[in-house]
């Protein structure tokens, strides 16, 4: 038996006994804050797509998304069929994914879907050279990447991965 097998690890010493629990609680809190922020931001971004002149409706949604698709097609290389299909799914996807994150439903998979959705949005904004929007979405993607690193500390979820 080697001497290293007889030596207790520093984490197992009495002086460090409570530190892993404290660290775990802090990481759980950090993940929860990230999950709630990303979920709320995603949900509200989806709901805002249904707004027009102070009211929310499906008619507003299709008008807004049609205008968005036309604008991106007119300012980029992307065809209207592609931008229109993405735009018509976008608001619903944001609402469903945002709600799933807030509730903690399959959080790891939901975070990946959220990240992919934001990368898709970034692609459209890159195509129309909207650098401020790209930077804004890059921050969101960074937060999602951070949440994916911390997802193993997800203690408050309705349906875990």
Residue ranges and their predicted role:
Residues 2-67, 73-76, 80-96, 103-161:
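Extended, low-polarity transmembrane helix blocks
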């Amino acid at each position: 038996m080697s001497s290293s097998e007889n030596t207790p690890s520093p984490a197992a010493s009495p002086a460090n006994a409570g530190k892993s629990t404290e660290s775990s609680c802090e990481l759980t809190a950090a993940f929860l804050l990230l999950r709630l922020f990303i979920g709320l931001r995603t949900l509200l971004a989806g709901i805002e797509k249904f707004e027009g002149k102070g009211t929310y409706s499906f008619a507003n949604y299709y008008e807004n998304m049609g205008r968005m698709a036309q604008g991106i097609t007119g300012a980029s290389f992307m065809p209207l069929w592609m931008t229109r299909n993405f735009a018509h799914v976008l608001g619903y996807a944001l609402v469903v994914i945002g709600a799933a994150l807030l509730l903690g439903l399959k959080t790891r998979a939901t975070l990946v879907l959220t990240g992919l959705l934001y990368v898709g949005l970034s692609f459209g904004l890159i195509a129309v050279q909207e650098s401020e929007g790209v930077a804004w979405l890059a921050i969101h993607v960074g937060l999602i990447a951070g949440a994916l690193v911390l997802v193993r500390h997800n203690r408050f979820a309705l349906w875990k991965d």
